[in-house]
Amino acid sequence: MPSLKTLLRGVLVAAMLVAGSARAELNIEIIGGGASRHAISVLPFKDEGPTQGNLTPVIRNDLALSGAFRLIDPSAVANVPFEPADIRYPLWQAAGAQSLAIGKVESAGGGQIKISFRLMDASQRKQLTGGEFTVTPDRSRQVAHAIADMIYEAITGQKGFFNTRLAYVLKSGRSYALQISDVDGQRSQTILRSTEPIISPSWSPDGRHIAYVSFASQKPVVWVQDLATGQRRAVANFKGSNSAPAWSPDGSKLAVVLTTSGNSQIYIINAAGGPARRLMYNGGIDTEPAFSPDGSMVYFVSDRSGNPQIYRVPVNGGNAQRVTWEGAYNVSPKLSPDGKTLVYIRRSAGNFRVMSQDLATNDSRQLSDGSYSERPSFAPNGRMVLYSSDAGGQSVLYAATADGSSKVKLAVLNGDVQDPAWGPFNNP
């Protein structure tokens, strides 16, 4: 059984072990769905041609990838309404639709278009939500995500996450690229490219910065990069290894792992850099910190009990409390936004699987199926979990519903995607 020191070494060099070439954007594949999905039909919007396919197809894709909806094909019903008065409700009820999204696109002058939509309840025949957006045609995709967010919230009561972003690392030959994209894998942008490994991207709470680890100086150094300007600064470049950055909920601090004292230990630094405060004094290895949503606790991995397990400790120091008790190897903790659920990686029978644990009852369930999954993180509404996993010899991303009932796969055609992190609601 590998020790935690072996695990750490694997984390720091994992990016060097993945080969292949990568295309810029991720391709999405929906895999199954839960039994209690809401049946909805998103009809073609009137005159949506100027959006160049970036409106209703995007809305449908968003709703499908959430795992909360079952899409009814609008072409199966002999009714194409653009206004509520044109809806033939008995036909849609017979097709199994619980709600309908209808809309239209009009010229707004000055090179802009006005996109209007309504979400109608098929049984009560009333509007559930709706809105209007006046934008240039090249903003149609963002409007589609916003409409999907409104539909998601109207049906589930939870805030939608379709206008959030993902961060991940693409590996192509000897090149590493830190990228961000829409939640559906589109509109990808390269933030940093290097011939040395880039690992552990971590979003600031306001979504304006990303912390990550770069090996460009021949050792791991923690950097923070401004996404708007591209400017970056080294915030942890102490003697030895600097790794595993995690933001505090208010964005003022980072927890990092340093080896200045020998073994890997957790330190707290200001987000702008400066002196490091050691969180605990332990003879073993402590690593992979993650703040609780209220900022009062730091969850982490330690071998102090002999095998890697997850613990928590007050942010100002104190006695650590063990959190995971099932399994002999539990790593990579992340907390749900409400602080009630922990996701992590458990090794069992040689497989590395994403687990979800209720912190009140300690009940756990398995979310992933592959033999090697890593780096789980929650969507900002807590309803989905993003992680990387193996699929046919390729490293890809999966997003699973928090109850494990549905998942989607995001992959490049001929490359590897690794170290994912789901961004916050505050999308600049």
Curated annotation (Swiss-Prot):
Q: Which domain of life is it from?
A: Bacteria
InterPro entries reported for this sequence: 6-blade_b-propeller_TolB-like, PD40, Tol-Pal_TolB, TolB_N
Q: Which GO terms describe its biological process?
A: cell division; protein import
Q: Which UniProt keywords apply?
A: Cell cycle, Cell division, Periplasm, Signal
Please classify the protein's predominant subcellular localization into one broad category: periplasm
Q: Tell me where in or outside the cell this protein is found.
A: Periplasm
Listed GO cellular component terms? periplasmic space
Signal peptide region: 1-24
Q: How does it assemble?
A: The Tol-Pal system is composed of five core proteins: the inner membrane proteins TolA, TolQ and TolR, the periplasmic protein TolB and the outer membrane protein Pal. They form a network linking the inner and outer membranes and the peptidoglycan layer.
Enumerate the NCBIfam families for this protein.
Answer: propeller_TolB
Q: Function of this protein?
A: Part of the Tol-Pal system, which plays a role in outer membrane invagination during cell division and is important for maintaining outer membrane integrity.
What is stated as this protein's family in its record?
Answer: Belongs to the TolB family.
Q: What is this protein called?
A: Tol-Pal system protein TolB
- Recorded name of the encoding gene: tolB
